[in-house]
């Protein structure tokens, strides 16, 4: 922005030029989200919110705005299917000392999930309302956001009277440090995936040269073996068969 101003230019963040020419643009993904129980996460949503608020308090922040999909899902103990190979939902979140807001398409949340969120003090608002929320931050308050992560429009929506703390999201490090329950989940997942990969290797050794196969068909076979394992959801990346 400063560079543009020196050249008598201006960066506009609130206009999507593609909307003006893409008449049949697909709607945003709206796959159903699901909730992870504490038996898998090791920590409840309330525990995570409490830890985040302690960090906010230590830095003098009144509000936290989160835009990292993985951090939002970690904080809310929710998962989605809006991005290939990554179980996240299109969302934003805001946290204050007294409440929290999840900006998401309400249609992807079951009645049960919505009730659980309400019990934990989380309000649900439409996905795009994060911008209006940011515009209405209390005067002379302080908001924390990671300017390397939030989009430029969110930053532009912050009122001039609101102080911005540019800081690593307080969810980032706790998300990275796995608790005992999560570590055990990793171990079990690797065992199940190892069974699927071992079955693929056995299948390859007994069928190579006997039936037609290429990288695509082998990838499909691996996916077939993985789908047969308990609790399988989907691949974490496209298989590198070669």
Where does each model-flagged region fall?
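Active-site neighborhoods and metal-handling regions in enzymes and metal-associated proteins
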Residues: 1-242
